[in-house]
From Swiss-Prot:
Function: As part of AP-5, a probable fifth adaptor protein complex it may be involved in endosomal transport.
Self-association and partners: Probably part of the adaptor protein complex 5 (AP-5), a tetramer composed of AP5B1, AP5M1, AP5S1 and AP5Z1. Interacts with ZFYVE26 and SPG11.
Keywords: Protein transport, Transport
InterPro entries listed in its UniProt record: AP5B1, AP5B1_barrel, AP5B1_C, AP5B1_middle, AP5B1_N
Protein name stated in the entry: AP-5 complex subunit beta-1
GO terms under biological process: endosomal transport; protein transport; vesicle-mediated transport
Organism superkingdom: Eukaryota
Gene Ontology CC annotation, any one: AP-type membrane coat adaptor complex
């Protein structure tokens, strides 16, 4: 079959783009990739059609060549097509380079055994360096664009295999001084420098002269697949964000370069920074992030290299660069920014946020930067929200919120105002223009707009968003809280239809505000006349706030309202309030009301519910009523106890405490998976047990809450039923589990019983590291061993052997965790301790009665546990 024409390809590509999966599943789908590669070499197709084909291959490379062999063949064909292009200028050269790179990356074919990879890498390096271009790669005017494209392709390969181009650092460093595109070369050099520093710091090696240019014309390879394989993807953030101090300590190694390497490194970074002004703002931000991240992990290297750039960047109008400055400040603090720099930057942000012509997104950016401003010396604890110390009254006066602002901008400014009020500890009552006065004025204005009858729902939503923000920031500010509660009460009085908003607010606010707000709303709801049009909203509010309240006024309101409840919706709302009162025990007044409702309500469903509630109130105590009508997460099975009236109604609702009908024990443990699993065995003793639910509670706060385990049925005489309980330790320590069983009997009764507590031993938390490739065990263990210090601790313990030898002890207790064994003399053992610790053991040559054990761990708190465990092995 010959090559397709332009119209045929246009129809084929249109059908593919309409539904790629459906097209590939059809008859023409199998040949699409092969035909595309073949027709790229056809002279009958125009260059514009070939551009369309290559564009499709860039967008859908993973669908056209989904596996490594297909991607390898496609990349080889694309490179052959590139070589066969005529010498005249062509738009295909850049697209062919991009398509070959994309095919290798998306098909996961990039590697040392890939022939296309070994062809593409030297070609891209030659193009990026400006040499080996030759006449076959276009005219000199085209080669500048090819050089930029080659740098982009190399950058993509480096991102997929970090450390791959570490050997080309010296060559790449020499490129910015030559004639050629500055931006792609600078970004590529910064990326390779960043990745090389991280990879070398992981391995503990220095830069080893990598920054010095070498001559690769002799055929030596400047790329290193070994470094790329050693990269650990979780160490590299996926976006330009700075880690917290804790994240840095856990995941970012520190490199201490030699004096020669430090000198070359400073020169390379200074070279990139000196030409950074020639880059676009987005490219400059990426460059600063890469260099800042890399230098942050260098011991003894102060960030003074960035100082000359601050003169230019502190006055920039580009938001991306301003964000980069704040990122540098968050990373280096007072090591790079003086107090004058900090004051200037904060004033710059404050004045920028006051510009009247700013669009809302830009306005929000400035406000967010002020709210999250990284101070040199913050006074409060880490993670606590606070206004910047240098943000004085004069600076923030222009940042006060106004009702004329966009809602998102108003909330952001209100957030800042709340932080200023939190810092204003004096709270002078005669202060008429202070932060608290501004806050009360804004809240009053928002409440007045929300109270307009028939006003837009958006105004009410904004008012409640602002109220929640104030309660969240000023929990302990009694004056503001009192003002807010009084204003919300007036708002409900004016517009009861906002009851759903009030219910949602009560669910979200802190307990300090919830209780006084609940009392005020209860008073407002019961004070309204029962025949008003807002009756349904008052009933909805009472269903939320009536529980635990004084019932006399509430019952009086309900008795008056019952006469006006004429439809099914009002009946249900009225019964929901009765249900809320039932949960706190009810009383004679409630019983009389329920009897009246059971006789007077017009629909049968309402009468049945009222009769049911009356029976519950008559037969159950207050505590049982609370369990029966208010099922919680702690007792989910009790909701099923509600059933129709019958002779055994009262008995069926009672959960009886009995002796344990089952036997629960700890079985043999299996060390595998991401989290420890406690293997349990359960057996029924004398009678069948149905719908069994086992609930576990951990003493203390050592573990995350444990999920309940459900078993449909257990019968006596059956083999032990295995259960697997997933443990999520907050620290690697043994624990004691209290167990309760909730179950149903053959007679249909619900019972509960307490079981003997279970012990989680220290060894039950042990987890192995993933299986390693053969031959890499010793290097892996040495890397873990070296990474424990200086943050961790090292110790030596004597492990008695008893009657068994060293090999038997290791085989019985430590076999899953052995990284490398050289019996009978040496065992290297690596154990993961959740959530994020490890324990490393070196068992040396056994003596007559024991074996010396050298151990390291990154968690000093486990040392006593390790000693007790090793000394107790011989006694098992």
């Amino acid at each position: 079959m010959g090559p397709l024409g332009r119209e045929a390809w246009a129809q084929r590509l249109g059908a593919f783009r309409a539904s790629p999966s459906a097209f590939l599943a059809g008859a023409e789908g199998e040949d699409l990739g092969r035909d595309l590669l073949s027709d790229l070499r056809s002279e009958k197709l125009s260059e514009q059609t070939k551009v369309s084909l290559l564009t499709l291959s860039l967008e859908y490379s993973d669908k056209l060549w989904p596996d490594a062999p297909a991607a390898e063949a496609a990349a080889t064909s694309l490179l052959d097509t590139l070589v066969l292009l005529p010498t005249r200028p062509s738009a295909l050269r850049r697209l062919l380079l991009l398509a070959a790179t994309t095919a290798l990356v998306s098909g996961d074919a990039l590697g040392p055994t890939s022939g296309a990879s070994c062809r593409l890498l030297p070609l891209l390096l030659g193009l990026a360096s400006g040499r080996d271009l030759g006449r076959s790669f276009g005219t000199p005017s085209e080669q500048r664009h090819l050089q930029a494209t080659a740098c982009e392709c190399l950058g993509e390969l480096e991102r997929c295999k970090p450390g791959l181009l570490a050997g080309a650092l010296g060559m790449l460093r020499s490129l910015p001084g030559q004639t050629g595109p500055i931006q792609p070369v600078s970004l590529l050099l910064a990326l390779v420098l960043h990745d090389t520093l991280v990879v070398q710091s992981r391995s503990g090696a220095g830069l080893q002269g990598l920054l010095v240019a070498e001559d690769f014309s002799t055929g030596s390879c400047p790329w290193d697949w070994t470094l790329a394989e050693e990269w650990d993807a979780h160490l590299k953030p996926q976006g330009p964000s700075w880690p917290t101090a804790g994240e840095e300590e856990r995941g970012f190694p520190v490199l201490e370069p030699s004096p020669e390497d430090a000198r070359e490194l400073k020169a390379a970074v200074a070279q990139l920074l000196d030409t950074s002004y020639l880059l676009t703002p987005v490219a400059q931000a990426q460059l600063l992030w890469l260099l800042g991240w890399a230098l942050r992990g260098l011991r003894g290297q102060p960030p003074v290299l960035f100082k000359p750039q601050l003169v230019r960047l502190l006055g920039t109008a580009q938001l991306t660069l301003l964000h980069s400055v704040l990122s540098l400040k968050a990373a280096f603090g007072e090591a790079l920014f003086t107090a004058q720099d900090e004051a200037l930057l904060l004033r710059r942000l404050t004045l920028g946020a006051q510009h009247p012509a700013l669009p809302s997104p830009t306005h929000l950016f400035y406000l967010h930067c002020i709210l999250s401003f990284p101070e040199n010396c913050p006074l409060g604890p880490e993670g606590e929200e606070a206004a910047p110390l240098l943000l004085g009254p004069q600076l923030c006066r222009g940042l006060m919120p106004s009702l004329l602002h966009d809602p998102t901008v108003l909330l952001a400014r209100l957030h800042l105002l709340c932080l200023l009020c939190a810092d204003d500890e004096e709270e002078e009552k005669d202060q008429t223009q202070g932060p608290q006065w501004f806050l009360q004025e804004v809240l009053a204005g928002l409440q007045q707009r929300a109270a307009l009858d028939g006003g837009p729902r958006a105004l009410a939503t904004l008012c409640f968003q602002a109220s929640y923000l104030v309660t969240n920031c000023l929990t302990r500010h009694s004056t503001v809280q009192t003002f807010l509660i009084r204003g919300l009460a007036q708002l409900y009085r004016a517009r009861p239809s906002l009851a759903p908003h009030f219910v949602d607010l009560l669910d979200q606010v802190s307990p300090e505000l919830r209780e006084p707000l609940r009392e005020v709303l209860l008073q407002e709801a019961v004070a309204r006349p029962g025949e008003s049009e807002a009756l349904c909203w008052h009933l909805q509010m009472l269903a939320k706030v009536a529980e635990g309240a004084t019932q006399s006024t509430t019952l009086s309101f309900l008795q008056a309202a019952a006469v006006h409840c004429t439809d099914w919706g009002l009946h249900q709302a009225l019964l929901r309030v009765c249900r809320a009162l039932l949960r706190t025990g009810g009383g004679d007044g409630l019983a009389n009301l329920l009897q009246e409702l059971a006789r007077q309500l017009e629909n049968a469903d309402g009468r049945d519910h009222a009769r049911l509630y009356y029976v519950l109130l008559s037969h159950l105590s207050s505590s049982k009523l609370g369990m029966a009508l208010g099922p919680s997460l702690a007792a989910p099975a009790l909701a099923s106890s509600l059933m129709a009236e019958n002779q055994g109604f009262s008995s069926a609702l009672m959960v009886q405490e009995t002796s344990a009908p089952i036997q629960l024990s700890v079985g043999p443990q299996q060390a595998k998976g991401p989290l420890p699993v406690l293997c349990l065995q359960v057996q029924a003793l004398d009678a069948p047990v149905y719908s069994l639910e086992l609930r576990f509670r951990v003493e203390g706060q050592l573990y995350e809450p444990l999920e309940a385990v459900h078993i449909p049925c257990l019968r006596p005489g059956q083999p032990a039923h295995p259960l697997y309980l997933l443990l999520q330790p907050r620290c690697p320590a043994p624990a004691r589990l209290h167990v309760r069983a909730l179950y149903s009997t053959s007679a249909g009764l619900t019972c509960h019983a307490r079981l003997p507590p279970l012990s989680v031993n220290f060894a039950d938390l042990f987890l192995p590291f993933p299986r390693l490739p053969k031959g890499s065990e010793l290097r892996f263990f040495d890397e873990l061993w070296n990474s424990c210090l200086p943050k961790g601790v090292e110790s030596r313990v004597w492990c008695p052997l008893g009657q068994q030898g060293l090999e038997a002890l290791v085989s019985q207790y430590l076999e899953p965790f052995v990284v490398l064994a050289q019996p009978p003399t040496t065992y290297l053992i690596a154990i993961r301790l959740p959530p994020a610790s490890m324990l490393l053991l070196r068992l040396e040559k056994a003596q007559v009665d024991g074996v010396p054990v050298a151990l390291r761990t990154d968690d000093w708190a486990v040392l006593p546990l390790v000693g007790d465990y090793l000394r107790g092995l011989a006694a098992h």
